[in-house]
Amino acid sequence: GAQFALARNGSVIAEGYFGDATPDTRFCMFSATKALVSATCIPLIESGALDPSRPVAHYIPEFAGNGKDHVLVEHVMLMQGGFPYAPMGPKQWATSEGRRERMAGWRLDWEPGTRCAYHPMVAHWVLAELISTVTGRPYTDVVHETLTAPLGLAPLIGPTVVEDPCHDVRATGERPPDSAIAEVLGGMHYVMPSTIALDALLVMNRPATRIAGVPGGGGFARAGEIALVYQRLLALPAVAFEVRNRMVSDTDNVVANR
């Protein structure tokens, strides 16, 4: 099944659904969840509670392990941290202590800030831990209070998502060969390695995983809810009038709006 939604000026103006989806069905947002967690950092930065120019270790001392003391909050938000495939599993992510212990053991693949590469899951575990640290509350609660509660929406990430019907993740089709992806993207240097196995995606069907609120891909939402969240972000003065542009790569000239 599938849903679609189109929003403008703060309202959903068109939506529909296909297959076995209904208007009430929630789908796993996967990486669209990242935007919720990153956007929650905006008011924390604006208030001074979180400083993007400070090292992550300023807020999470354990993170400094194995030479990561100079990784900045900004590096993590721009996916320049240098630890894209660092490990983090259910046994660690269940508690703050477990997350911090795992982060302490991570090692860098390159010098932070020197290149940009997609961090499939772990960068947003760092952001989630930062949110919890500077607010003293579970990051899932802060995401809801910042983004979804003002819209009158139920939480899209965290323990309460299991209260609504959620469409199970299904495996369909096969990954195209790297050569086909390169043809579409314009070169092999744009093709990311396939690092997320099918089992890692299907784990989102487990109630315990949904309750955990995986910040890099564990949100559950209807299409209209996602559209409304982005409408709210577009309306925030800090986003509409104070966006700073940073070229994240001198070679591909990709602009990151923050």
Locate the predicted segments by residue.
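Conserved strand-loop elements at the edges of beta-sheets that form or border functional pockets
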Residues: 6, 31, 120
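Short, solvent-exposed turn/loop segments enriched in Gly/Ser/Thr/Pro and often Arg
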Residues: 8, 56, 119
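Active-site SXXK
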Residues: 10, 28-54, 127-132, 229
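Short, glycine/proline-biased beta-turn/loop segments that scaffold the active-site neighborhood
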Residues: 51-66, 150
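Short, surface-exposed loop or secondary-structure junction motifs
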Residues: 66-258
